[in-house]
């Protein structure tokens, strides 16, 4: 794969075009003409000649030639969460036809970190050795700390920090993928950045250099399952979406429980539900206040289980607030 990464958006929207036009309009026109020749004439011609029938996309993100990418056509790179410091919850409101890049950083797990930082005196995210293995420098460390303390309570030590950073990353990308899939058919694709690493480093990867799965990798495996049962609060209502990437229709039993953390069931609902192939639709909606039956949002979570006609169970949990605001029992 030859990947033209963000070149058109960079030229049009990152100030490059304006700056070079200000210096030399003729030179700027030449750059754009060469760009058009390479990505809209030469390369698609090569693909047609040597791989007829192969899909060609001139840039990513891209919607129309000579225009910035947007939310109504083509694909979109979304980095307001992470680089832009927007809250993770913003994933639930962002739209696109195809989210082709977004991500959230984490460190490798403790056992992997010990491979390149074996001494306890280096077990600090700003130690010299840890900084040498941070893809985004201290700016990225600051973002991790900011997001972590916004969503979770302060970790007790370095090892706990690494673990909670993994869960934070997994929560963020799970939130994004579920939102994108609920938007079907308006949105028909979601690709997170990134899968793995070429060296041991803090990065956006879901598997570290040594092949160890981060929490994110487990989360996305489930979030990308052929059927997704996803709960979300919209306005005053709790809604449960059934999303299917299967081509055929299916049916099964949907169970919803609002549970306290000691296992007490506050509210229960169950029904036989049909799910259309290649579709997303709301299969349950009710006022959240009614479901809570007087319970505080921080003392409960929503559990949904869908059992299809073959007996396979799809399960998902949903918290009604930030993790630091949940009243978890001490263990």
What do these predicted regions represent?
Residues 13, 27, 38, 42-51, ...:
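Substrate-binding clefts and catalytic carboxylate motifs of secreted carbohydrate-active enzymes
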Residues 1-2, 191-193, 304:
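Extended hydrophobic secondary-structure segments that form protein cores and membrane-embedded regions
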Residues 5-6, 33, 58, 101:
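Residue-level detector of functionally special positions within alpha-helical transmembrane segments
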Residues 18-19, 114, 257:
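Residues in and immediately flanking transmembrane alpha helices
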Residues 237-286, 296-307:
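Beta-strand-rich binding/interaction modules
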